[in-house]
Structure formats: C-alpha cells, structure tokens
C-alpha cells in the first residue's frame, strides 16, 4: 500500500488578498518541505471568512476560475513543488456564485 502525506492548513486571514495568498504560500511550501503530497489551505483563505451571512457586497468577491489570483498562483506552485494543492475560492460563473474547490 502506498503512503500519502496530507497537510491541512488553518490560518488567520486579513482583508488583504495579496497578503493572505503570500501567507498561504509560505505555509504550503513549509508543508511540502515537511513531506506533504496533498495540501489543503483554509476554506476561502483569500479573505476573512465571510460566509456566515449573506450580504450583497460579498458578491463582488466572486471571480471566475481564470480571474482568481489564488487559483492561478497555486496552480503554478503545485507544478513547481510536485504536490497537489486544493484551493477553495468564491467563484462566479456567468450569474451564479459558488464556494468552489479546485485541485
């Protein structure tokens, strides 16, 4: 049987998307260096968690998979490190919003 090491990352997030992506990147790299092959950052880690309530202003956070900075960044990071990174993001597809996971 093959052994697989999985890392789950729980981190505090700020309102600064770029800062949160950079923080997650450091933690993902540390997990990969420690031997993790599958890495799962916190749910919707790009921002402070906002899903407790439905507010119109949150709809602006949603982006398509192609426009999402975290998805694009961690697609490249996964290739570079040779690991699987599971990224949760708020997706907009036409006029429908999803809490999506991409691998």
Predicted feature residues:
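A generic structural signal for ordered alpha-helices
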Residues: 2, 9, 52-56
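Active-site-proximal beta-strand elements of phosphoester/diester hydrolases
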Residues: 3-15, 100
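N-terminal phosphate-binding loop and adjacent alpha-helix
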Residues: 10-27
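Cys-nucleophile CN-hydrolase/nitrilase-fold catalytic domain and related Cys-dependent amidase chemistry
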Residues: 17, 29-103
């Amino acid at each position: 049987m093959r052994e697989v090491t999985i890392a789950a990352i729980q981190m505090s997030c700020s309102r600064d998307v770029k800062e949160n992506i950079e923080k997650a990147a450091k933690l993902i790299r540390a997990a990969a260096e420690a031997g993790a092959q599958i890495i799962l950052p916190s749910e919707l880690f790009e921002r402070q968690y906002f899903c407790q309530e439905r507010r119109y202003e949150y709809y602006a956070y949603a982006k398509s998979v192609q426009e999402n900075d975290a998805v694009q960044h961690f697609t490249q990071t996964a290739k570079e490190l040779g690991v699987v990174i599971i990224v949760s993001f708020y997706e907009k597809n036409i006029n429908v919003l999803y809490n999506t996971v991409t691998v």
